């Protein structure tokens, strides 16, 4: 039996899905990740347990299903719905925005980049630009370039945009498996307090950040271990008394739109496995302890006595995990040479220094770069698109492909493509790329 024929062991019948997980042990080579170690070691003695077959209720049948409500997923759902497709959005937490909101990674990077005339210009438009403008109008955004936003205001704005677009929102639910028919994805199993259910869809968009769906569908990918951190916010930073005897400068992060509140980033430990739940749990506790101890030390410093820990992020700062092996792998050379693509779905910028041809080029000099639609398409699975930090690119681009702006751009591109595919009754890989670009322009995206 081929991997794809087994993936979920499903039979669609009536109003329920028969699920037979645990029918056999999958070989490592069948996952397309033969060079990878298992995420977790099995129980001592290699013990396993069989999950009984059961009937799974179908919650909904829809045009487009987006899994993951971070910047990419939110933009994808809005774009899909605005394109006329009935759209469901499933998010495991109680908010949209992912690391932008729940992760307290508050800067919208990178809204600007250098064009061919060596001028700095705005590159984030469309749905991402609309989000930014709404936050500015609320007084909840500071800085014109790479604005820093208030997370609660951003949650509100994203909720409103989802509601206005007519997206069907499902919080507190987690995708647990995919429903496959030969090489086509037909839906997703979700877990929640309501139990296991299925949502069937004509097109599914993987915006999980970790590529959970394309992994479950059997696509090939790379795994990149990277630094994982935890952001926190400090309050009363406007009460710091620099005139106190013994005052010394302390690292208290950067300002936010709320007076007296700063956000403080943490790079964290290098080479961390974001796919290992035990590792994530250990990091969560360790980082929270370190942040608490750090703030107590700050409060002992003359002049900082009134500073307090406002909150730690509800999400760990996972920067990278799975990277899709898709139809086209975006390269460093592409992004540094203004390469144009016939199937461009958006443009992003850079926020960090890049070593290129033996020279360190600062972000302030780095060019804007196009993102091709092919980089969002898996090689084998039909009716599946990928957006966010796990689309197809070279590892050297990790600092630019994982930022909020890029996630918004890839999300809108995938959502518009999904809506167009449903409208035309085609698989996403078969849609007319010119029509996709026209649709994106109608939605306000800038394609260069």
Provide a role label for each language-model segment.
Residues 79, 85-86, 91-177, 232:
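Conserved N-terminal/central alpha/beta ligand/cofactor-binding core
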Residues 55, 127, 155, 172, ...:
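Flavin (FAD/FMN)-binding glycine-rich loop and adjacent Rossmann-like elements that form
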Residues 1-5, 27-31:
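N-terminal secretory signal peptides
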